[in-house]
């Protein structure tokens, strides 16, 4: 019989529940698992998770801090038994990567609004992950969707614009929500001009 552990993780474990939030599920397996729907589960092999723990990967920290065991084939708590992940040391390179994603998406949306929802979604991902990786590098990780507003200094952005970015993310990843209108795209583009300076300032607080 196949060894398997199932965990819930993410927003539901933070109590961040709203119409757009999904239940994130992790399935840990020791071999091929064709019966598990990859649309519904993040599927990881045990050795891959052990490797992520060993390198102090942000996803390992996320699971360590915000997951709940739902099912265990052998009564053990696999993630719990892995203990505390290694120290996160990739803050600089990860933040540089997300800054680049932001810059590229911002350029793309200014040139053409064809795939604007996708570009806004990437900008949201970049800003959120930048803040999360920064907070993790300081040793007090914030995995919330609103992490850019919870770090110090926070991103000074109009709440309406931030909600447009969040909606774009939900539309792109879950196909959920109201389509984003031209005037909303314009609002978002105008408001995110503050992002590059914020990113630079945030990383100087180390």
Language-model regions: role of each:
Residues 1-3, 13-19, 28-206:
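Catalytic core of pol beta-like nucleotidyltransferases
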Residues 23-25:
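A structural signal for short, well-ordered beta-strand segments
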């Amino acid at each position: 019989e196949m060894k398997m552990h199932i965990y819930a993780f993410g927003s539901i474990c933070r109590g961040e529940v709203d119409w757009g939030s999904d239940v994130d599920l992790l399935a840990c397996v020791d071999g091929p698992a064709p019966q598990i729907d990859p649309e519904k589960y993040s599927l990881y092999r045990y050795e891959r998770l052990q490797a992520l723990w060993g390198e102090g990967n942000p996803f390992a920290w996320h699971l360590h801090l915000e997951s709940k065991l739902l099912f265990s084939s052998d009564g053990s708590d696999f993630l719990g038994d892995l203990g505390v992940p290694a120290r996160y040391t990739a803050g600089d390179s990860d933040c540089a990567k997300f800054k680049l994603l932001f810059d590229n998406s911002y350029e793309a949306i200014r040139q053409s609004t064809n795939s604007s929802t996708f570009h806004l979604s990437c900008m949201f991902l970049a800003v959120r992950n930048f803040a999360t990786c920064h907070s993790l590098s300081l040793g007090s990780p914030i995995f919330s969707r609103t992490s850019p507003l919870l770090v110090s200094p926070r991103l000074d952005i109009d709440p309406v614009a931030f909600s447009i970015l969040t909606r774009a993310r939900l539309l792109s990843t879950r196909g959920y929500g109201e389509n984003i209108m031209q005037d909303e795209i314009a609002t978002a583009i105008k408001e995110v001009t503050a992002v590059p300076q914020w990113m630079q300032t945030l990383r100087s607080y180390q």
